[in-house]
């Protein structure tokens, strides 16, 4: 039960904006973990040797207290937004992740022995007048370590929308890879089915407050690499100034997940993969595009890329000669040019191809993950109201 003054606080906050207004979250662009390692003269495989050939998902174990969480690019994203937790507000940089459904941030109770904790903003429950303990322990297990913590309840503000939210205070963070991360925590934008511990996800709590004109959110990533203004997430709709033409919608293919049918992957108008269909998810929590190891191997061989220290690379002089790679989603095709899917770091002569092999076992996989490399080219609308994803060409 809310105390009376907490209720008044929430009501007064809700009166600050119209229920049909778009609620905006500014995204900032940061170096990804991969880019941070590059700046330090290190490669991913130097830090995480198991990535040298491919990454394999752990078997899912979605039960109440412990679950295996997909590693992919170890939340190797470049985009974060700010939220606040508590009263007065404590500010956190979080990744808005469509591949998960829980909110976690480092806790003040995290031991100084975990250097990844002390290098980030930490939630201090003793400084919040609206904090309520829950205490249920939770472990999120990664391929290279784990996050341990416990559930707490407090007022979380996202785009100035206040909600009462259960979240995880992380008290154990592995140094690898999180010490290299520029974000503090993760805010899952997935369905309740993915939520560990049976908590209600943040976006579901926002929807229940009836403050949005539509139960959708849209994601825009800026293409302008020279700016640290990374883009925007809009709750309740989309912004026509971010895209051209119309949205084309694809229904989700699996209940409770942002999965869609991928009808093919083609090069030069010839389908080379997924002839009989595959499954893909639009993953805002990762930078690269990933797929089954056997498929990625064929794709990279087709464009002439080779595997080196865990990454697919190609001679930088050949970038302009490479073909478009096209994804068939619904009745539309979505192409990526070589300047989009090939990355050049500093003055290196070998450039990194933004594809990687990730084998996800059944029942969740096999699965393609279309990360920031894809999202930068297409404005994406995630529609919970109709269980579909919309795609439009972004500016």
UniProtKB/Swiss-Prot annotation:
- Gene3D superfamilies for the chain: Acid Proteases
Q: EC annotation?
A: 3.4.23.15
Q: How is it modified after translation?
A: N-glycosylated.
The record's Gene Ontology cellular component field reads: extracellular space
Glycosylated residues, chain numbering? 64
Chief subcellular site? secreted
GO BP term, pick one: proteolysis
> Where does the Peptidase A1 domain lie?
79-392
The UniProt keyword set, sorted, is: Aspartyl protease, Disulfide bond, Glycoprotein, Hydrolase, Protease, Secreted, Signal, Zymogen
Record: active site: 97, 283
Tissue expression per record: Expressed by the venom gland (at protein level).
Report disulfide bridges, numbered on this chain.
110-117, 274-278, 316-351
Activity modulation notes: Inhibited completely by aspartyl protease inhibitor pepstatin A, but not by the serine- or metalloproteinase inhibitors PMSF or EDTA.
**Residues annotated as signal peptide:** 1-21
Q: Where are the transmembrane segments?
A: none
A GO molecular-function annotation: aspartic-type endopeptidase activity
Q: Which residues form the propeptide?
A: 22-43
Q: Which family does it belong to?
A: Belongs to the peptidase A1 family.
Descriptive protein name = Renin
**Organism this protein belongs to:** Echis ocellatus (Ocellated saw-scaled viper)
Q: Which gene encodes it?
A: Asp-Eoc51
């Amino acid at each position: 039960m809310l105390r009376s003054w907490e209720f008044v606080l929430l009501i007064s906050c809700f009166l600050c904006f119209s229920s049909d207004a778009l609620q905006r979250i500014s995204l900032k662009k940061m170096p990804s973990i991969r880019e941070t390692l590059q700046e330090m003269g290190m490669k991913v495989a130097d830090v995480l040797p198991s990535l040298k050939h491919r990454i394999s998902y752990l078997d899912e174990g979605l039960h109440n207290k412990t679950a295996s969480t997909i590693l992919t690019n170890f939340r190797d994203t470049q985009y974060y937004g700010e939220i606040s937790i508590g009263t007065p507000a404590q500010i956190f940089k979080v990744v808005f992740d469509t591949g998960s459904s829980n909110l976690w941030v480092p806790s003040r109770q995290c031991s100084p022995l975990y250097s990844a904790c002390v290098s980030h903003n930490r939630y201090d429950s003793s400084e919040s007048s609206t904090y309520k303990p829950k205490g249920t322990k939770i472990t999120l297990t990664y391929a290279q370590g784990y996050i341990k913590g416990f559930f707490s309840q407090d007022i979380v503000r996202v785009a100035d929308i206040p909600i009462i939210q259960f979240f995880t205070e992380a008290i154990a963070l592995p140094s690898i890879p999180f010490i290299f991360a520029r974000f503090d925590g993760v805010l899952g934008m997935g369905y309740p089915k993915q939520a560990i511990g049976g908590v209600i996800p943040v976006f579901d709590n926002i929807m229940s407050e009836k403050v949005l004109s539509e139960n959708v959110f849209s994601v825009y990533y800026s293409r302008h690499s020279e700016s640290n203004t990374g883009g925007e997430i809009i709750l309740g709709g989309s912004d026509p100034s971010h895209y051209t033409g119309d949205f084309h919608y694809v229904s989700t293919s699996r209940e409770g997940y942002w999965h869609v049918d991928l009808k093919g992957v083609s090069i030069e108008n010839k389908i080379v993969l997924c002839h009989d269909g595959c499954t893909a998810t639009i993953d805002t929590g990762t930078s690269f595009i990933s797929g089954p190891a056997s498929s990625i191997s064929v794709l990279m061989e087709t464009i002439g890329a080779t595997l080196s220290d865990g990454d697919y690379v190609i001679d930088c002089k050949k970038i302009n000669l490479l073909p478009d790679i096209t994804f068939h989603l619904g009745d539309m095709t979505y192409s990526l040019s070589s300047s989009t899917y090939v990355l050049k770091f500093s003055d290196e002569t070998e450039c990194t191809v933004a594809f990687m092999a990730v084998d996800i076992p059944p029942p969740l996989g096999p699965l393609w993950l279309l990360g920031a490399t894809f999202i930068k080219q297409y404005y994406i609308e995630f529609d919970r109201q109709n269980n579909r994803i919309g795609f439009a060409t972004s500016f």
